[in-house]
Structures are given as C-alpha cells and as structure tokens.
Amino acid sequence: MLGREFYSNVSHVEQGERYTVSHHGSTEDTRQGGNDDLQNTPARSNASTDYSTQSLSNQAGMQPAARRTSMVTEGHVARSQQPLTVNTDFFRGTDQPNATPHPQADPARYAYDSHFHPNTEIANFQTPQMHNYHPYHPNLYHHQYPMHNPSPLHHLQQARVGQMIYQTDPANPSGFPQASPSDLSTTSSQSYYHTGRSSPSVSSSTCSSPVELEDLSVPAKTRPADGFTNLQRTTCPDFSIPSTEQCMQELTPRIRPPSAEQQAPSIGASPPQEFSKASVFLCNSELWRKFHEHRTEMIITKQGRRMFPQLVFRLSGLNPAAHYNVFVDMVIADPNSWKFQSGKWVATGKSDGVPRATGIFKHPDSPNTGEHWMRQDIAFSKLKLTNNRGKDSGYLVINSMHIYQPRIHVLDLTGARVLQTHSFPETQFIGVTAYQNTDITQLKIDHNPFAKGFRDNYDSFATRERLSYVASLQEQRNRTKPVQCTAANAIIPSDTTGFPCQTNPTQRSNGQHEGRPLPMKLIRASEPCSSTNLAPACNSGSGMSGDAICSDSAPSSTIRHSPKSIGEREGALPNLGALNNSGHPGSVLDTPPNQSPHGGCERSNEKHTPAHKLGEGLGCGMLECGEIPWLNTPPSVCSSDNSNPDLPSAKRLRISPAGSGSPSVTSGTSLFTSGSSAAPSPPLLTTAPTAHIAPGLDSTLSTEGVVQCSNRSLVMPQPYYGVGGSFAYQNDSHMGYSYMGQTRQGLNLATSAPYYYQQNN
C-alpha cells in the first residue's frame, strides 16, 4: 500500500535507473529494469533488529518489473514518511543528458553531499564546512562529518545492523518539523537519517552489498524507544536529478589550478590569442653566407674565444610594454664527428657522450621591454666559445669537430610566458682548435678587423699571386740600367744639404752592384734641377764607373724610387730640412707597395701622386704613370671583397722598427698597426756629421747609416721595403726588413730570392 501510494507521486523512472529515496526513519529502494537489475530486499519484522541486503548478482530469476519496498523502523512501521534525499547510485547511462538541479538546491551542498561520492572516506571527512541546510526541505538538516574533531579516527564507524540514530532539537522536543529553522547556525538542529545511509550503497566491483555504519559519537540514550510520531507524509518534490558527470565537475573547484605566474613556460603549447609572434632577422646574413659556403669554423680555447662572424639579430612584432628575456644557445646539428681531409670536411662517425645542447647565454640587457629590444640591433658580442666545462656564465661549452646550430630564444615574462625559438641555417659552424680550411682563414683576415695575428705572420701563408708580383718586380729591376749623371736630366734638389747627386756607395770596380734607389719622399717637387749643385757631385764620381742615379731622357728608362704608397700621406712632400732633437727619423716606412696606408687596396690614381704632377715636380717632364712600376699595382693582390670601403684591408705587412741586437737610427715604434687605417704623419729626417772623402776613393757607409760622398752627407732611412737585384736584406723581427751594412741580428739573404723570407727569432 505504501509502495503504491509513494510511487504514484514519483516521476517516471527510466530503464536501468535506480533511485534510493530516504525518509525519516525509512529508506525505499526502487528499481525498474530486467532480471539483472532486480534486487530483493526482504522486509524484517518489528521484533527483528537485523537488516540485510542482497547483491545484484543474487537477484537473478526474479520476475521482470518487480518492485519491492523495504521499510525499516525502530519498533514499528511508520504510516507517513517524509523524503530526505534522492540518489542515483551512478546507474545513469553515459548518453543521458546532464539534468539541471533544482533552483532551490544548493549546488555546493548537493555536490559535496556524501551520497554522490563513490569514496566513503572522501564523502565523510573531506566535505566543506557549511551549514547543514537541506536543499529540498527547509526544516531538514543533514548531519555532516566531521562534527567535532576533523580527524577521521574520532568518527570511526562500526558496522551494525538496523538501528536508527537521530538527534532531537531542544526547541522542538515533539519531533515535528517546524515551518522554518530557528537558527541556521545551530549545530544541534534536528536531523534524521537511517543507519548506513550517511554512506550510501554504491555499486562497485569491490563492494557487492551496502554496509550499514553507525555513528558512535551519538550516545545511545538519545535514541527513541517508540520511533517517530506526528510526522506528515509529503510528496516527493519535482526536481531533476543531476548526473554523475555534473557532480564530478562541481568537485573540481576544490583543487585550485596554479596561477599563470607559477606555471612553467611550455614550448609546445599554443600561445594565447592576444599574443603576437615575434619576427627575428639576422643582420649580417650576407657575411654568414660567405663563410657558410666553405663550412664556417670557430676557434675554441680553454680561456674562451669570441665568435666571428658575430650573432647580430633584429626583433620586431613585440609588445612594447611587455618584458622579455633574450638569450641564445647551441644544439648539435649533426651527430657525427668531422675531420678536414683532402681539402674538404668528411664525417668520421657518430660520437657518444656529446651533450645535445649547450647552456644558455642571456643577453646582458635582459630582461627589458619590447620597445628596448626593437629599438636597436641585438649583438651577442660578448659570447665566448670554450671547451672547458668548468667555465662560469658567459661561455658556451662545445666540443671540437662537431657541427653546432645557434638558436635565439625570446621569452615573454608576462601572461602565459610564451617561449619563441628561431634559428638560421647559415649560422652553423664547426668548432676547431685551429683553422683547417685556408679559405676560412682568408675570409677571417679579410673581414675581421681583430685578426692581428694572421697579418703579423702573413709570410707563413703567402699567396701565389703575391709571389708572382714580387718576381715581376725583381725582373723589372734587373732590366733597368743606370745612366750617366748630367746637368740636363738631374733630379736631385738643389737646396738639400744632405742629398747630393752622387755615386752609389756600394759601387765596386767589378760592377756587380747597382745603385740603391732613393725614396720618393727625398725628391723636392718644388725645386728644378740646378747644374751648379750637380757639378761637384758628378765630377767626384768620374773616377769610378761613372754610373749615377740620375735618370736618362729616354722614355724606356725607369726611375727606381719608392712611390707615395710607402708611408707618406697625400699632400705636400715633407721638407727635408725639418729636424728633430734626437737626431733620428720620426717614423718607419712600413707599408708594402701594393697596400695603401689608408686601409684599402689602391684601385685609382687618387692614392698616388698623379703622373703629370710627378713629372712636373721632377723638372724633367719625361715621366709617365705607366713607366713607374710601383704605381701599377696588380689587382690580383687586392681583396676580393674590397668593393666595400668600410672593410679593413687584408694581408698588410707589419715592419718592426728596429732589431734588438744593434743600434738603430729609428726611434719610437711603427706608425702603422695591422688594424690601423689612419694616415701617418710625414717622417722627419735628420742630418749627420759631415765627412770628407778624397776624390777617387770609394764612398763608404758609416756606422750611423750616413752615406758620405763629396763633402756632403746623406741620411738613409735604415728600415726599407723593396726588392733589388743586388741588395742584401736582413730580418731580425717580424717583417723587419732593413738596408744592408749594419751588424744586426738576423740572416743576410741573397737578393735573388723570388720572395721574402721570414725568420723566427
């Protein structure tokens, strides 16, 4: 009777669903379905205190659509019951749409209710602290765990059978529900529930029957002897039962996800919609491509060596207000180890134990705003490569003979902390301890202004073009013959005290030596030839072979003078009468004939004195540009990349000012260095004490470097660059060539050598 009366007020139950309806003092289980969904719960007698249920597996053979109602009371069967909660016991199908909870129900209370969690421990002891307000009836409250002590051990439950536990409300001793609760914060408010229904029966693979538990914290004397009275039966409210998925979704707010600042940046994650991808450009990509054609090599040392070409980037597309970190690292581009064999790089096999990636090198300006990064180019000029793993920050440890790929990373420090990585294939390089490919060495010299060591030791890798050029100069000098000095074609200045027209000091009677040419700077362009000054000098040499260094009027003759490219800058020629107090010349002529002191290969006549002006200054008017060999610099010795005037020239020779084993007439150091591009000041020459020599005697070279002839002295700059057919040069330091006659450290070399020798002291 009660079952029919109750089910008439319950909404339609779908196939395969089970509802557990809890009343004050009773619990009714309803089931609708096939034979496998039936449950037989026998009713117990009034005198019995046993309560038992059978599992679903023991219900086979029951009639379809059979309904049994089990009503458990303490001493009698209640005539009118009032429902408390409705439970689905997780029998709802997955295709069932999520039901909307009742608008009067508290979602948080309903979600965390013990009836909707499969874990008994979580359901009883991890519920949030809130009022025991029932979501469906304003006068009914659920007893929540824990009540006093949050420790689960205090509320350890013991399995018992069919007992009823309740708590009476002091304000309502009759047990009849009030219209509204007197105080929602009252912890001893009236609460009715059946033993075991605080932890509902949940069908699972590990539990075949529900377990009835008793709260030991409630004293036994508070239990009623005759059950409940004066309770009115009410119908089940019309509400939708939430699905299991909805209940589990409402549990997720209990675990707070980490904030955006605490989350680590994920490289593979997609950036947020408001994030714009940064664009990275390689500024010196053309230079990198030149090196990449020959397989770029980078020197690595224990102390650390900087890269050339450098990594220079330009960023765009960043948020100007956001902050970013910019850093680089390097990864192995190829697992093989390489070696340079037969002029090319050959893989030798895979190497084990090599780290795939290096550490990171953060730019010194990091962190900074996007406006700062986009304002200027980002150059990692302080990055150093090393093979010492004990180095601190500022170094990237790489292995030699392996190919590495540099990468640049842009990390957004705000929002989602998105990390962007960019790489350029032309920046790949091989780490070496010494350069293997000569093409890479040449490119380093041509483009790196700090490649000083290669220019100082240039003779160790002299090129074929330069050797052929030196041989051509030797051949031209051998074909030139000196002519008799006359008043008509003399070119020696008249107002110069120490520079007369003279015979060669090294002239011998056997005619094996030729005259040494005077430098171009010793010629006074403003003075014409004077016969009065030339007569004594020419007469003094009449007793010898008669050869002098005056030019013949024949167009085939060549004046063997050093051109303007040997150290003087453009402008007026220096005054030979200008002296200094120390009695030494002020600089050293240390620039080879094929190089300009201004830092570039000479391709135009602007680097030299014009031929027509040179002829006018000499007073003879018979010279042309094509007749001076050093004015015609072959283009083969010029750098292939010399179209850019800003690039420093390559292969300059650095001539040491003086040796360490003998006195020298030079003072100071060389005016030029390997990377210098500034024009030097004109050198100052000094006079020497006058020495008289008898006519007819050979002129000699004094220990002070003064050529004495015909009551006049000539100061000769001791270090001199050039190749002569019969002159002996010596080398006592790096590229330190000097004129013969001085006892200095070094080896006197034969003049027939086709190229210069380098002596390592």
UniProtKB/Swiss-Prot annotation:
Localization in the cell: Nucleus
Protein name: T-box protein 1
Keyword field contains Membrane: no
GO cellular component: chromatin; nucleus
Function, in words: Probable transcriptional regulator involved in developmental processes.
Record's compositionally biased regions (Polar residues): 37-61, 167-179, 496-510, 637-646
PROSITE patterns the UniProt entry points to: TBOX_1, TBOX_3
Segments of skewed composition (Low complexity): 180-191, 198-210, 656-687
SMART domains with a match to the protein in the record: TBOX (SM00425)
Annotated region of DNA binding: 287-456
GO process terms (BP): cell fate specification; positive regulation of DNA-templated transcription
Keyword set, alphabetical order: DNA-binding, Nucleus, Transcription, Transcription regulation
Chain spans, region Disordered: 1-85, 167-210, 496-515, 545-612, 637-687
Pfam families: T-box
